Amino acid sequence: MPKFSPFRWDCDKQGCFNTKCRPDFGVFYDCFPGKGSFTDIDGIIEINGKLLLLEWKSKPDTIPVGQQIMYKHLSRKCDAFVVCVSGDAETMQIDHALSFSKGHMGRWIPISTEQVVELFTKWAAFAKGGKESRNVRQGQ
């Protein structure tokens, strides 16, 4: 287990996190044209101006078009590396991943949680200014 955990919520003591803390974006639906709305980002970290976004899916299905557009733009314009993973959020077992890098979307590939941990560790070294790994930018 990691030495540090920023998530300090105890559902047994404080109630269901989703009920108590997850915003209902419905109040903002009429603010945007068409079907545009806020999306939740499952995880994001910034190191030296570089962004790593994590999107969790329960299975390796088609990424919604709106998210594809957003992730392509973010990866092209904001030095963001977006990784979508699929798996079991309760057990944290990841089975597939795809990435968005430099405006392009990859395809779902089989991958393990351990491999994603390794990918994120390499990305952090790259973001901190270490030797860039081509594999990190390509999501492999």
Question: What is the predicted function of each stretch?
Answer:
Residues 1-2, 140:
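Intrinsically disordered, low-complexity and often Lys/Arg-enriched segments
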